[in-house]
């Protein structure tokens, strides 16, 4: 659906230049929700705006539905932009127009007959669950309702792709939940490809099929959302994941961990176990005690939801005779769970 090849974007002013996108390569599949996350200034907004050529790339190419959009002239671009809609953080509704008129605007610009406009607008109002708000003005709506109107307007011309530029950043938690649920419905019912940028990892884990993490203009990491959350590779990815799910060892414990199991007498492993799906049904901690005469004391445990998957994350201190806990680690490494040895600590130091 979307292919980005060797994309670069450079801003030049006088004798200075600022490279904000550096050799971006990625492919977004038709019908998926693809997240792009990064800190402020990482380049994510510039990348999104290149996808509808609001920003002209300095180099590289972008293909959408097998069309090289970077080669289009102004007239061709106007036609192409009907296929790629966009919603924004601050809604961009016209305060002088009511809800009906805001949604109708792109249809009016295309010269659609009034009878067809009326039918289409009310279809969209039903779709975004605002059937009784046609005559309301933006100032009479909540933030979540305004974003729903913006989404309806974006869908007026039946686009193939919806670009979302921090669409939930200005919303309260309840409205954010409603907008994300709506985007998932639109994705499934309309087969709509959605590309969203955000700085909120919670948004990514709730609705994105895959995610790319951008750092300093480059893709630091990319993959399926569940894989990225459970096994982040890049430091910037780990920092984002830690803001969304509780994978980080508490600082007061981390300070006590040793890298070497033989640093002191009676030093035992502190491990992180991650379960998801049916894996969480296995009585692994009980098995450690039963089979190896070792004890797994839970330091911290959390249940998370990532892409509709239940994920359990437990940090445990495994104590006992050295042969026992070494055998327990070998046992865990052969089970269908993610095992990470975080360090070693004495029994009385945790």
UniProtKB/Swiss-Prot annotation:
<keyword id="KW-0997">Cell inner membrane</keyword>
<comment type="similarity">
    <text>Belongs to the ABC transporter superfamily. Methionine importer (TC 3.A.1.24) family.</text>
</comment>
<keyword id="KW-0547">Nucleotide-binding</keyword>
<protein>
    <recommendedName>
        <fullName>Methionine import ATP-binding protein MetN</fullName>
        <ecNumber>7.4.2.11</ecNumber>
    </recommendedName>
</protein>
<dbReference type="InterPro" id="IPR003439">
    <property type="entry name" value="ABC_transporter-like_ATP-bd"/>
</dbReference>
<dbReference type="GO" id="GO:0016887">
    <property type="term" value="F:ATP hydrolysis activity"/>
</dbReference>
<dbReference type="InterPro" id="IPR050086">
    <property type="entry name" value="MetN_ABC_transporter-like"/>
</dbReference>
<dbReference type="InterPro" id="IPR018449">
    <property type="entry name" value="NIL_domain"/>
</dbReference>
<keyword id="KW-0067">ATP-binding</keyword>
<dbReference type="GO" id="GO:0005886">
    <property type="term" value="C:plasma membrane"/>
</dbReference>
<dbReference type="InterPro" id="IPR027417">
    <property type="entry name" value="P-loop_NTPase"/>
</dbReference>
<dbReference type="InterPro" id="IPR003593">
    <property type="entry name" value="AAA+_ATPase"/>
</dbReference>
<keyword id="KW-1278">Translocase</keyword>
<dbReference type="InterPro" id="IPR041701">
    <property type="entry name" value="MetN_ABC"/>
</dbReference>
<dbReference type="GO" id="GO:0005524">
    <property type="term" value="F:ATP binding"/>
</dbReference>
<dbReference type="Pfam" id="PF09383">
    <property type="entry name" value="NIL"/>
</dbReference>
<feature type="domain" description="ABC transporter">
    <location>
        <begin position="2"/>
        <end position="241"/>
    </location>
</feature>
<dbReference type="Pfam" id="PF00005">
    <property type="entry name" value="ABC_tran"/>
</dbReference>
<comment type="subunit">
    <text>The complex is composed of two ATP-binding proteins (MetN), two transmembrane proteins (MetI) and a solute-binding protein (MetQ).</text>
</comment>
<dbReference type="InterPro" id="IPR017871">
    <property type="entry name" value="ABC_transporter-like_CS"/>
</dbReference>
<dbReference type="GO" id="GO:0033232">
    <property type="term" value="F:ABC-type D-methionine transporter activity"/>
</dbReference>
<keyword id="KW-1003">Cell membrane</keyword>
<comment type="function">
    <text>Part of the ABC transporter complex MetNIQ involved in methionine import. Responsible for energy coupling to the transport system.</text>
</comment>
<keyword id="KW-0029">Amino-acid transport</keyword>
<feature type="binding site">
    <location>
        <begin position="38"/>
        <end position="45"/>
    </location>
    <ligand>
        <name>ATP</name>
    </ligand>
</feature>
<keyword id="KW-0813">Transport</keyword>
<dbReference type="InterPro" id="IPR045865">
    <property type="entry name" value="ACT-like_dom_sf"/>
</dbReference>
<keyword id="KW-0472">Membrane</keyword>
């Amino acid at each position: 659906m979307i292919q980005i090849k060797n994309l670069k974007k450079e801003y030049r002013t006088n004798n200075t230049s600022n490279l904000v996108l550096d050799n971006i390569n990625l492919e977004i599949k038709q019908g998926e929700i693809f997240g792009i996350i990064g800190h402020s200034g990482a380049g994510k907004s510039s990348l999104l705006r290149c996808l509808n050529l609001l920003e002209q790339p300095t180099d590289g190419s972008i293909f959408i539905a097998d069309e090289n959009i970077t080669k289009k002239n102004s007239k061709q671009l106007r036609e192409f932009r009907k296929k790629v809609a966009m919603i924004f953080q601050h809604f961009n509704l016209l305060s002088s127009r009511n809800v009906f008129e805001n949604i109708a605007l792109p249809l009016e610009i295309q010269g659609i007959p009034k009878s067809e406009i009326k039918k289409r607008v009310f279809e969209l109002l039903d779709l975004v669950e605002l059937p009784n708000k046609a005559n309301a003005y933006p100032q009479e709506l909540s933030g979540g309702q305004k974003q729903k109107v913006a989404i309806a307007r974006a869908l007026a011309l039946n686009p193939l792709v919806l670009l979302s530029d921090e669409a939930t950043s200005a919303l309260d938690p309840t409205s954010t939940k409603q907008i994300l649920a709506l985007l998932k419905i639109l994705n499934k019912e309309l087969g709509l490809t959605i590309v969203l940028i955000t700085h909120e990892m919670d948004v990514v884990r709730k609705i994105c099929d895959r995610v790319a993490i951008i750092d300093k203009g480059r893709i630091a990491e990319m993959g399926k959302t569940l894989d990225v959350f459970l096994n982040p590779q890049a430091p910037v990815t780990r920092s984002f994941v830690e803001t969304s799910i509780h994978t980080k060892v508490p600082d007061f414990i981390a300070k006590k961990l040793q890298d070497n199991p033989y640093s002191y007498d009676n030093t035992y492993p502190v491990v992180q176990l991650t379960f998801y799906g049916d894996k969480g049904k296995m009585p692994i901690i009980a098995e450690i005690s039963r089979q190896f005469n070792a004890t797994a004391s839970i330091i911290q445990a959390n249940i998370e939801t990532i892409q509709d998957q239940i994920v359990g994350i437990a940090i445990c201190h495994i104590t006992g005779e050295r042969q026992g806990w070494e055998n327990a680690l070998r046992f865990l490494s052969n089970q269908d769970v993610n095992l990470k040895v975080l360090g070693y600590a004495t029994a009385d130091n945790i």
